[in-house]
Amino acid sequence: MKKWMTFLCILLLCSSQTLLPVSATPAKSVSSTPRQTQITVRTATNFKTESDVKKFVQLASKYKISVIYLNVKQDEDDEVPSGYVYYKSKVAPIAKGYRNFDVLKSMIKEAHKKSIKVYAWVPQFHDRAALKKYPNAQMKTLVGKKTVAYNQNGEYFVNPLNKKIQKYEISILKEIAKKYDVDGIFLDWLRFDDYKMDLSKSTRNAFKKKSGYDPITISFSTNNAKRRQWNSWRTSQLASYVKQASRSVRQTKKDILLGVFILPPEFTECGQDVGKFKSYIDVVLPMSYYKDWDFTPSWVYGKNSGILYDTQKKAKNTSIIPTFDLPSSTQKDSYKTIFKKTQKNYPKIKCINYFIYGKWKESHFKKIVYY
């Protein structure tokens, strides 16, 4: 979820359909219990056996965790190639070492015994498995005056505008909703890495049909009318995909909770505008890693600016759950201040979420500052 720190964000350009207004989905209650603490966990680094799941859930219960966001589809190209899954899928390839170990099934069984909810965390277009299936669907960017496949740091991304890719990704979401008693499905990697993508031929043609000019003629390094038009179009395509995914999943399981992890709204180069897809989800999780981007703590809780201000302004009537790194020993007082100010300035926020990239140990649970 967070490795984009080294190359900021990822791709996402979705359906070429025009975004049509639909009635907003009634917001579901995330929880009736105030001030809950949730965690997000990567599967490859945490779960190799059933015993690993049981021990993890015991720790989560001990440290009063209300929700576990489980990585059911690999998010990065590291221990496992991106896009490989950790459940019994007939759609996506199962990760090596997990063909006889259904992590999602095991987690639901153990967590529900402890009254802990399980949300399936499903990254979308950072997907080497999909690229292997559809080799012509790789994301394209601009280098000099040439369009080239985007393969930053050995990472693999597919073009979200590709119809086959869209259908494939949504079929995974539907499979999870149909086969498993998950309490929610949460999407990630719904974004671009920069203004210069996607620039595949099909995307360029679709935008040119709408605007009258080829996007490769845009000066991407400056803030200008054409770049703003391009970015507005990209954000609308992303919203159109979320709309399609939401409707498809809810046709499978009507009342399932749906959400999206987002980058700070001020990162406009990522082509992600929660204001355009808020009506199709119940929860938004803004990634509030203030230290990673050299912001002060007030950037999180500011009453007139900052990530929560921007998110609430765009996503009115949508539940907001800010996501944080675990605090270091020198950050604990800062986190206490952040939470106190957040409760004052944003009283509707009732939950926070913690994420770490590696393995959750008891020493990590002990670092939790409760909301």
Show which residues each predicted segment covers.
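Polysaccharide-binding and catalytic clefts of secreted carbohydrate-active enzymes
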Residues: 145-280, 289-295
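Substrate-binding cleft of secreted/luminal carbohydrate-active enzymes
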Residues: 281-371
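Active-site-adjacent "subsite" loops/lids of carbohydrate-active enzymes
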Residues: 31-40, 48, 119-120, 125-179, ...
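Catalytic domains of carbohydrate-active enzymes, especially glycoside hydrolases
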Residues: 52-79, 179-184, 277-284, 348-352
